[in-house]
């Protein structure tokens, strides 16, 4: 089995994956949402300190699951890029110590590639029995919308080490814009779930009232690129123009209108990708990353995939956000290829360089 570690941002997570059949044997995750909600976003120093406290705590639970017998572990995998340097280092230090103690190889995993491999994981059960993967491999070629943290990208995957970057954001990411709008509205952090909740409630309670209208970013731009800064600013100005304090109805209308505009922007750019020469033989498309849990985004992209006869692949909702299970299933591919990193050469990086990741 492979022990995997995830600490790229504000989630401390460990997992055990079977090398033979890619089944998830054990998974534990501690989130820091409550600690960061007061600040409206991640505070790196707080995140680092909490990882230093919590990673050893959940390692004790993992050891107890194995009855303190770590001999079945044949490799340790850890996220080394991209992410916050002060949190990545906490995971890497633990991984190095485990590799030295167990005399097993180290596997460095790109966090973004881990999100892609989250497509293969089933939801964990309460008793943590072995969970078989949905499939043993990803369909290829595979078009991918990656909406995770600071990333909004369209990727074209031909093989494990052949992933082309098709489009990315010029400024804010899809997820960051949700966090910023939630902060403008005083709704706390993280913004994605709360904005979706307000939007859903508004559409349910006021079915005959159109939500606040916002411009779709880059509406007449035919280039494969994203931008959310203008939309974010339009929301800020709309909030300022409304009577204060905002009513629940106004908050819901803002959330619904913003969500519709942001998702329409995504759909329009994915449509351009589907119409491109590179995607003409594409049969499979996937949405991955924490923000891929948004129901409205899933629904609108599913409709687009049906229009273009593409099979849509979605990660289980339990594994959309950061987790060690996705790092583990990706690490299995590294393990099979003999792709190990000497302990003294392992490094972290806050960025994922194009020629490094793709």
Swiss-Prot record:
Which annotated residues bind substrate?
Answer: 146-150, 179, 192, 294
Its localization reads:
Cytoplasm
- List the HAMAP family hit by this protein, alphabetically: TsaD
| Residue numbers binding Fe cation | 111, 115, 322
Q: How is the cofactor bound?
A: Binds 1 Fe(2+) ion per subunit.
GO:BP terms for this protein? tRNA threonylcarbamoyladenosine modification
Q: Which UniProt keywords are present, listed alphabetically?
A: Acyltransferase, Cytoplasm, Iron, Metal-binding, Transferase, tRNA processing
Sequence similarity: Belongs to the KAE1 / TsaD family.
- Which metal ions or organic cofactors does this protein require, according to UniProt? Fe(2+)
Entry's SUPFAM superfamilies? Answer: Actin-like ATPase domain
EC code = 2.3.1.234
GO terms for CC? cytoplasm
The protein depicted here goes by the name tRNA N6-adenosine threonylcarbamoyltransferase
Show the InterPro entries listed in the entry. Answer: ATPase_NBD, Gcp-like_dom, KAE1/TsaD, Peptidase_M22_CS, TsaD
Q: What does this protein do?
A: Required for the formation of a threonylcarbamoyl group on adenosine at position 37 (t(6)A37) in tRNAs that read codons beginning with adenine. Is involved in the transfer of the threonylcarbamoyl moiety of threonylcarbamoyl-AMP (TC-AMP) to the N6 group of A37, together with TsaE and TsaB. TsaD likely plays a direct catalytic role in this reaction.
Tell me one GO molecular function of this protein: N(6)-L-threonylcarbamoyladenine synthase activity
* Gene3D superfamilies xref list: 3.30.420.40
**Known catalytic reactions:** L-threonylcarbamoyladenylate + adenosine(37) in tRNA = N(6)-L-threonylcarbamoyladenosine(37) in tRNA + AMP + H(+)
Q: Please name the Pfam families in this protein's record.
A: TsaD
Q: Species name for this entry?
A: Helicobacter hepaticus (strain ATCC 51449 / 3B1)
